[in-house]
UniProtKB/Swiss-Prot annotation:
Compartments reported by the entry: Cytoplasm
Reactions that this protein is recorded to catalyse: tRNA(Asn) + L-asparagine + ATP = L-asparaginyl-tRNA(Asn) + AMP + diphosphate + H(+)
Tree of life domain: Bacteria
MF annotations from Gene Ontology: asparagine-tRNA ligase activity; ATP binding; nucleic acid binding
UniProt protein name: Asparagine--tRNA ligase
Family, similarity comment: Belongs to the class-II aminoacyl-tRNA synthetase family.
Keyword terms, alphabetized: Aminoacyl-tRNA synthetase, ATP-binding, Cytoplasm, Ligase, Nucleotide-binding, Protein biosynthesis
NCBIfam families with a match to the protein in the record: asnS, PRK03932.1
Amino acid sequence: MKMLVKQIYENAKELDKSKIKIKGWVVTSRGNKKIQFIELNDGSSVLHLQLVLKSEKMDLNDIHFKTGSSIKAEGILNYTPKAEQSVELIVDKISLLAQSDEDFPIQTKKTTLEFLRTIPHLRHRSNTIKAVMLVRSSISFFIHEYFQKNDFSLVAAPIITSNDGEGAGETFIVDSEDKEPFFGNNVKATLGVTGQLHAEAYALGLQKVYTFAPTFRAENSNTKKHAAEFWMVEPEVAFFTLKELIQMSEEMLKYVIKKVLEKRRDELVFLDTHIKPGLIQSLEDFLESNLEIIEYRKVIEILEKNKVFFEEQNIEFGMDLKTEHERFIAEKYAKGPVGVINYPKKLKAFYMYQNDDNETVAAFDLLVPGIGELVGGSQRENRYEKLEQRIQELNIDQKDIQWYLDLRKYGYSGSAGFGLGLERLVMYITGIDNIRDSIPFPRTPNNLKM
């Protein structure tokens, strides 16, 4: 029967002494005239399957497979759980599908992540990037599964839009080569920085919605946390309060992490061993944690008392927290995930609900050790006059988002939603510390390979 490596390891006991057919790529090859061992990987798992070739079954002089070559083999599966190699295939037939050139850049010696970034078309054939991308795939699946199980509707937010949802102005302009404006005169088309505004429109009718799409920021930042193109998960729920939103974000993260720990255990064990020791324990600790909620004002007090530990020591109310501050709160103060609420309104987007103090908004950031901000969300401003006033204060062109204001005229009693950067979550779950290694084809300043 045809099998994948992942299926073989998951069902090894039942498959013992079964005839198996498999296709994949050569990772290593070694041996002598009497016996040869080939490590094969087929992309379904970070684990390799050892193929055993014996001279009494075939002429080993004809077996010359270079690293990276694709092959097919069939034979009898041998399951020996107490042996160092618990599963191996005793090969009856083997053939070359496509030989790999000798200059295949991913060999058995350890390859740095920096080098792998120079070959984005091949780097997923390394163990590390393969493990990360398999985990990423499962994370995406379980995010969808969580929302679908909880009666959310997936909304396809547009990639091309006429408004800057965050109001930061860091957008990529979209146009054609024609002399005439493609979308008409006086229309500034950009790549979307968020699907939140469109999700909010659909929540006013479908109640529970989410978007899962690429977003774009023309932010000239060359840090480990920033990319020009990344994926955002943005749920929006009508009638929701900030408290309910925070509870949902914690529940969703725990659901996804628990499922990934079950589904991608082999990949996480590899990453725990080679990338971030203690990774699995930290994820299991997250599942057992209770999210602590703390006011932004309290955070400032804590940081002020500990400012000697920071590069940015100008601590005051109204400051935008740096990653070092966020990590300190999560790692040293809370010693786990923490939700920071009620940020100064000047730090947040125009659409957030203004608290009675007229100084803060009903917003939250969920901070986690090792990353800092993982999730950011808010209750939305449902009062037309308040929202209009805030738009004017920030000098946002009202005509571009009049439709968003108009939502408040037609039965809008409020909603709440958050944004989760998929790559940030991939980094947290895999232990990878650079966003460039959490996405298949990273787009960053001065970097547009492929």
